[in-house]
Amino acid sequence: MINNIIFDNKNRHRIFSILILCLFGFCLVQAMQAPKKNAKKRPQGERVYLLHADELRYDMFSSTPDAQILKGKVSFRHQGSNLTCDSAYFYQGSNSVKAFGHVHYRQGDTLSLICDRAEYDGQMQMMRARKNVVLHHRRQTLNTDSLDFDRLYNVANFFDGGTLIDGKDKLVADWGEYHTETREAKFVYNVKLRSGKDVVTTDTLYYDVLKSMAHMVGPSKIISGGSVVKTEDGYYDTKADKAQLYGRSTVVDKDKTLTGDTLYYVKDGESTGYGNVVYVDKKNKNSLTCNYLRYNEKTGKGFATRNPVAVDYSQKDTLWMHSDTMRIYTFNINTDSVYRKVHAYPKVRAYRQDLQAVCDSLVFNSQDSCMTMYKDPVVWNMNRQLLGEKIMVYMNDSTVRFAHVVGQALSIEQMPDSVHYNQITSNEMKSYFDHGEIKTAESIGNVQTVYFMTDDKDSSLIGLNYLETDTLRMYMGPGRKMEKIWTNKFTSTMYPMTQIPPSKYKLSNFAWFDDIRPKDKNDIFVWRGKAKGTEIKNIKRHEAPLQKITN
């Protein structure tokens, strides 16, 4: 009895396992046979109707025994569409038509297709048109030699070269598809889009007819006037002449190049760049890098921030300049008297091997080629330091022709021993240059000087000359060597090195700011202000005249 019970349990277990396997197999088969969610069901049993033919015949011994042979003004109707042609083979069994000569297919009031020959499958609702195919849909026209139109999905495919015309836009490609319902198209291989005078070339392009928007994928190029845009992922609005470019795109306009991770480019309008933006002007040999840039071609106004760096490489030594924000303004644009102003602020730091500078704000005016530094400006050249309330430097091409320090001017030259300093202070200073070399230096108003004299033989210090006057003019020779001095009324005291009073070594406003001096091009990003108590006296300042800009 126990054996019978065990046998029965084994049988029950075996039967249960078989049932589970059968159920699993049934579910698997059902899953494999389940239709796709997005697939549309092809309607069955809707016949193609022959409306008219001048001649109809049937030949069971011909090469088409199952076809009705039709000639003369042949016309068919199927599910709201009409097909006319010169002659046709009508296959009632398969619910299909082969049409020849002046084939014309119409669907509603918005779609019309003409070709030399076609095959229409009523069962699959598929129209295959060949030779001189022209598809008209609303305002769009598609020309090709081979086109398949799927009525169920409302999509037309061409695969032997085609042209889509949408108003002023003309699209050419080797292969493509056009959705009549959504009015969207896709073009692949040797794609070219002409929109007015603009030309787009790419490998893959998605085109939205309703929005006149082209999406370029892969290496692409837009030629617009004198500008060339290169991108691998871009959107181009043919109506507004603007583009959204992603993935390290570039805009080239003659000698100027703009590159960025993301660029919003507007022809004759405002363009914007985000992420690692690089602007290069090859003609003038300068560049600008930042993480956010905005520029309007119509107004000539620009704005750069998020770590902007301006670089000038027009000279033997390259100049790097950094500030929190940079702006550009253009005046009298589109005239012969056009000029620009560039503003950099705050925390301006600049470095060149032979020149360094810091200030709160800076303005460059191309009208008079003047660069003005405001609020605690300091300029260094080799072992010399110059500071004041405002420093103006006038350029001749890329070389200095005139420098003007206004208010609390102080010029210091560090001696070779790094202990003693030649010093001049006055209300203002003027320096005149010839081919970049200083020729004349003039100090005006409350002039005080501390000058250490040296031995001509070994350059050792032999004494100190302290001088006070109203005006002092120095004439320089080659190598910035002083040749002569002119002054009017003055008082002067000469001290031997062993008899110099401690108070005469340095002027009362002496300050040596070597600790805030930029050391190299990477040091321009680290702002170091003057130590407390060393700032210029708190009097009425010369403020940078910033123009307003609409954000």
Where are these regions (language model features)?
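Bacterial Sec-dependent N-terminal signal peptides
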Residues: 1-39, 550-551
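N-terminal amphipathic/hydrophobic interface segments
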Residues: 31-551
